[in-house]
UniProtKB/Swiss-Prot annotation:
Transmembrane stretches, start-end: none
Protein name: Small ribosomal subunit protein uS13
Keywords linked to the UniProt accession: Ribonucleoprotein, Ribosomal protein, RNA-binding, rRNA-binding, tRNA-binding
Molecular function in Gene Ontology: rRNA binding; structural constituent of ribosome; tRNA binding
Described function: Located at the top of the head of the 30S subunit, it contacts several helices of the 16S rRNA. In the 70S ribosome it contacts the 23S rRNA (bridge B1a) and protein L5 of the 50S subunit (bridge B1b), connecting the 2 subunits; these bridges are implicated in subunit movement. Contacts the tRNAs in the A and P-sites.
NCBIfam families cross-referenced by the UniProt entry: uS13_bact (TIGR03631)
Region (Disordered): 98-124
PANTHER family noted in UniProt: 30S RIBOSOMAL PROTEIN S13/40S RIBOSOMAL PROTEIN S18, SMALL RIBOSOMAL SUBUNIT PROTEIN US13M
PROSITE patterns per UniProt: RIBOSOMAL_S13_1 (PS00646), RIBOSOMAL_S13_2 (PS50159)
Lineage of origin: Bacteria, Pseudomonadati, Dictyoglomota, Dictyoglomia, Dictyoglomales
InterPro entries: Rbsml_uS13_C, Ribosomal_uS13, Ribosomal_uS13-like_H2TH, Ribosomal_uS13_bac-type, Ribosomal_uS13_CS
Entry keyword Cytoplasm: no
Length: 124
């Protein structure tokens, strides 16, 4: 099992797919990394040599922001939006959709489970 950017890559998967287990690397970025390092995308992780693993590790560390650094940057960007009080920041703060989706119905992912509001009974 190869360890790159603090993530254990599954050894039975192809390198192209295994790299996507790292936060911040998708299929396209994975292909670019493999092309830059000259590693065969169809090779399994268990078949990689130490030299190839170190090439991949070096390429990712030097040219891409991944895992903790990327998560910190995203969180900082959201925090900045909230601090300046712009529309997007307010939507983040309230836990509502940020990109203009409708909220009259749907938007359950952002809003969470329904909070049922019932009528109070009159006391006798």
């Amino acid at each position: 099992m190869a360890r790159i950017a603090g993530v254990d890559l599954p050894s039975n998967k192809k390198v192209e797919i295994a790299l996507t287990y790292i936060y911040g690397i998708g299929r396209t970025t994975s292909k670019k990394i493999l092309q830059a390092t000259g590693v065969d995308p169809n090779k399994r992780v268990k078949d990689l040599t130490e030299e190839e693993i170190s090439k991949l590790r070096e390429e990712i560390e030097n040219n891409y922001k991944v895992e903790g650094d990327l998560r910190q940057e995203v969180a900082a960007n959201i925090r900045r939006l909230i601090e300046i009080g712009c529309y997007r920041g307010i939507r983040h703060k309230r836990g509502l959709p940020v990109r203009g989706q409708r909220t009259r119905c749907n938007a359950r992912t952002r809003k969470g489970p329904r909070k049922t509001v019932g009528a109070k009974r009159k006391e006798k």
